[in-house]
Each structure stands twice: as C-alpha cells, then as structure tokens.
C-alpha cells in the first residue's frame, strides 16, 4: 500500500496522527538532507509536539492563489491516490481541514480530471483551505522548477475559486 491510503486509514480508523514527508526509500535515504532528517527525528521523539511549525528551507517559495486565513487539521496526500480512493471507505474526508495534495509524473489534463473527480464526489466540501504541494516532473510541461509548478495554478484556481478559501501553492 502506498503512503496516502495508509495515512488516511490510520487517521480515520485508529485516530492517530501520521507524518507526511519525503518518501523514505526514494527521497530521504537516497539524498539525505540534514534539516529533513532532524525534523523527522524531532517529531517521532516528541521534541516537536502537535501544532509545531517547521520552517521551510530558504529556497522554498509559496504562491498565494487565493488569500485568506484558515485553521484545521492537515489532511491529504498524493492526488492520484486520493482520486483513486473516491467511492471507497478510505476516501478522503477533509471537512473542517486544510487539504493538501501533490503528485509526480502527471500531465495537466490528468491533474484536471482528478481534481474534477474529487470535486464532483464532494471531497472539497467544507474544506477550510488548500495547500498544493510539489508536482515534480509534470508531463508535457518543460522544466521542473517554479515555472513548471506555475502551470498548475490556473487549474487549481478553477477548481477552488468559487469556495472563497485560501489556496497556497
């Protein structure tokens, strides 16, 4: 099982907090980054409690797609897996929360379809805010940095603008 469905099942049925971060096998162990590794150790050891904020690295930038203020539990994961869980007992329930999603190796039309599927299924109902994570290697979009990520912004705005909630990417 991939992490997103496992996170959702643990949160919903066991009531436990789960941690999202770099994929252990692919990202964390292969290219270990001291700040990421330290943050993980601080969280699992209890040095960082619930609600603690970990500063983003200096090179990280957020784009405000819709301004506002929101509080709530952070829930989400890989967009393709969230869409695949639609209609199952493990489907995402982000009511009163801040929805986040990310993905890798997806094309813009597929991202649009997955967002539409989730929206039509009611997955965005009651969401207080949205955080768009990294979409690495967007198929059909040149580059892999901020310019490529910005190709998503019109799609994201289209799916969330009528909700009047803050959206960061």
Language-model regions: role of each:
Residues 15-81:
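Conserved anion/nucleotide-ligand pocket segment
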Residues 1-23, 163-166:
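Short, acidic/small-residue loops that bind anionic groups at enzyme active sites
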Residues 74-112:
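Oxyanion-binding "anion nests"
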Residues 19-22, 101-102, 131-135:
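Short beta-strands and strand-loop turn motifs
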Residues 10-11, 66-67, 74, 91-93, ...:
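Solvent-exposed alpha-helices and their adjacent loops that cap or buttress functional pockets
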Residues 14-16, 70, 95-96, 125-128, ...:
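Short coil/turn connectors at secondary-structure junctions
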Residues 113-169:
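C-terminal active-site/capping subdomain that shapes the small-molecule cofactor and substrate pocket
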């Amino acid at each position: 099982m991939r992490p997103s469905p496992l996170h959702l099942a643990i949160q919903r049925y066991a009531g436990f907090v789960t941690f999202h971060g770099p994929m252990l096998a692919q990202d964390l162990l292969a290219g270990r980054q001291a700040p990421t590794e330290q943050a993980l150790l601080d969280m699992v050891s209890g040095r960082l409690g619930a609600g603690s904020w970990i500063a983003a690295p200096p090179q990280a930038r957020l784009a405000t797609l819709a301004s506002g203020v929101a509080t709530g539990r952070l829930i989400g994961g890989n967009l393709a897996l969230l869409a695949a869980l639609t209609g199952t007992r493990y489907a995402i329930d982000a009511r009163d929360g801040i929805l986040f999603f990310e993905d890798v190796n997806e094309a813009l039309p597929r991202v649009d379809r997955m967002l539409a599927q989730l929206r039509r299924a009611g997955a965005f109902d009651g969401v207080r805010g949205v955080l768009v994570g990294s979409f690495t290697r967007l198929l059909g979009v040149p580059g892999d940095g901020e310019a490529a990520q910005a190709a998503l912004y019109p799609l994201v705005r289209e799916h969330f603008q009528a909700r009047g909630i803050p959206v960061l990417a």
